[in-house]
Design a protein with these regions (language model features):
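Surface-exposed cleft-lining segments at the edges of enzyme active sites
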Residues: 7-13, 38-41, 104-107
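Histidine-acidic metal/acid-base catalytic patches
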Residues: 23, 49-68, 74-182
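Aromatic-lined carbohydrate-recognition surfaces of secreted/lumenal glycan-active proteins
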Residues: 34-47, 68
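Structural motif corresponding to the early beta-alpha repeats
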Residues: 1-24, 31-35, 72, 129, ...
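Short, conserved structural micro-motifs that define repeat-unit consensus positions
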Residues: 1-5, 41, 95
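A structural signal for alpha-helical segments
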Residues: 13, 17, 39-40, 47, ...
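Residue-level detector of transmembrane insertion/anchoring sites
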Residues: 29-30, 59
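Alpha-helix N-cap/loop-to-helix initiation residues
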Residues: 11, 44-45, 76
């Protein structure tokens, strides 16, 4: 779930309203024995790790936990290692996709600036047993030819439109390569 979209630069103006509404959601989830997973989506209260931590401090427990999305943090200008350190005790679900800080383009896991391999390693070393959800938002993937050459080549590479199957296969293969190196 997302918290709420907030006009840019207005987090403090809407903070109380966001927390009131999120509290209502968490109360409902608690009453119905459900778990809400909050994602760090761009443009919401909670796109940056600091706001996610504030939400976790207020509501984290059996019925409210965090989703960690590497690409969304990169696209929001958030250092993912810093985000992980702030949120590691609340992460229950991981969206596996990466992004380039230079332009925000989504790329296969490990090919961007999200520190995916390092953070996955830390998660597993800390006993993470949650899900890894592939998010192959790669249908208009720039840099297909640069996959073997690294992220600089990807940023400058050709564009190829991928089918859903191709995008999922690429996302899956990229994750497997990272996991095999651990």
């Amino acid at each position: 779930m997302f918290s709420f979209y907030i006009p840019e630069g207005k987090n403090e103006v809407y903070r109380a309203q966001v927390f009131d509404r999120m509290g209502q959601f968490v109360d409902y989830a608690t009453a119905n024995d459900a778990v809400l997973l909050h994602e760090n989506e761009k443009g919401i209260y909670g796109e940056k790790a600091k706001e996610c931590r504030e939400l976790m401090d207020a509501f984290s427990g059996e019925h409210f936990k965090a989703i960690f999305d590497f690409a969304n943090f990169v696209q929001a200008g958030q250092d993912t290692l810093e985000a992980y350190e702030l949120l590691k005790d609340s992460i229950a679900y991981v969206h596996v996709k990466d992004a380039l800080a230079a332009n925000g383009n989504v790329v296969p896991a490990g090919m961007g600036d999200g520190n995916v391999a390092d953070i996955l390693k830390r998660l597993f070393e800390n006993g993470y047993e949650g899900f890894l959800s592939l998010e192959p938002h790669l249908f208009n993937f720039s840099g297909f030819a640069g996959l073997e050459k690294g992220k600089d080549a990807i940023a400058e590479g050709e564009t190829k439109v991928l089918s859903g199957f191709e995008a999922f296969s690429l996302a899956h293969e990229s994750l497997l390569r990272l996991l095999e190196k651990m």
